[in-house]
Amino acid sequence: MKVTLPEFERAGVMVVGDVMLDRYWYGPTSRISPEAPVPVVKVNTIEERPGGAANVAMNIASLGANARLVGLTGIDDAARALSKSLADVNVKCDFVSVPTHPTITKLRVLSRNQQLIRLDFEEGFEGVDPQPLHERINQALSSIGALVLSDYAKGALASVQQMIQLARKAGVPVLIDPKSTDFERYRGATLLTPNLSEFEAVVGKCKTEEEIVERGMKLIADYELSALLVTRSEQGMSLLQPGKAPLHMPTQAQEVYDVTGAGDTVIGVLAATLAAGNSLEEACFFANAAAGVVVGKLGTSTVSPIELENAVRGRADTGFGVMTEEELKLAVAAARKRGEKVVMTNGVFDILHAGHVSYLANARKLGDRLIVAVNSDASTKRLKGDSRPVNPLEQRMIVLGALEAVDWVVSFEEDTPQRLIAGILPDLLVKGGDYKPEEIAGSKEVWANGGEVLVLNFEDGCSTTNIIKKIQQDKKG
């Protein structure tokens, strides 16, 4: 179906809450420590990502919306790393620095796609003067379409009731991802987004969907909420509003690798969609699709517009289909963290025929993901002559992306995809025809990275050139 995404570029959202830095240490394990019965991890990769409220802001910015972030940090390396990472993804930060406290940091050690341990460095910000936070909210209210209060129970939202009142007085919707079981703190909010366990911690165990609805509607009435969205993991999510029938949305996740930060993605997409002028029902639709994408990634992650569009078209994953080069690199990185083997091939694919389909199916069988790099129209013309391509690039890529064997499609402008291949570095590079492996563009780079290069045979009797000739002959006849 044709999907029209919200106009995220005109959406302004402020996020206020508990910001933190997520650190990831990756490496192989091959032995047990002689000091204790624990694995020894040889760390070879270190990553730092914004977490908590900062991850919410990143999710908003990744959609192309204007994201502002307010929170409490220390004056330390973690705060500086947070600021730099967020500036790099167009999040405008306005942190309140507290010299007596460290920036909240969570360190995770992973090996073989498993998290071995998490170490938390924090003291919490309870008792810190909230007035600087209130001032920042007041200054922004005239230029934002939604306020997100991201509560991780670390102290930044100690004065959450005053924050809600400031926004409601200005007519700005307030969305809250709650951590406290004392929902009195959130009285008057526009929307609360508890997950099922958080919801049941307040209302008690719910055995049926009807109980969720009944108790949820009572919460709305008791705490003067405008709406309640209960995220229910593999059961999807349920939107409850006074005077309206419940809206239950099934999950769109196809593969679940990590639920870290999924709630951040949900509330981020909700806020950006509402701030863009869409209805709450539409916002929930897009948020549900985004959640299905992000749980297929490892660690706190964001969703790009093309991933979201692919997801609402029913292809939720790491972003199937046509991609830009940068989006492809992110998708490949996510696949590698899951231990998947990436195969790559390239060609013009002007008039797709049975030989192409058979070749691509065979290439896909050699790994877990298949990338098809396609010559641009200008590149094709230089390679094949002025009469080619018959089909423009966009149409060629759409057809390729619809094939079951193909995961990702990307274009390149040069005569060969050598630069593109060098940037992706697939585990296996394949090419059809009578080439020698060393003649294939990108082979040297793939070999140098420890990858493989393989030549596959095309199906006999299938040729785009022959198809074009036959069409021309039929026209003459």
Curated annotation (Swiss-Prot):
ATP binds at residues 195-198. One of its GO terms (cellular component) is cytosol. The keyword Acetylation applies. The keyword Cytoplasm does not apply. Residues 1-318 are annotated as: Ribokinase. Homodimer. This is Bifunctional protein HldE. It comes from Escherichia coli O9:H4 (strain HS). The gene is hldE.
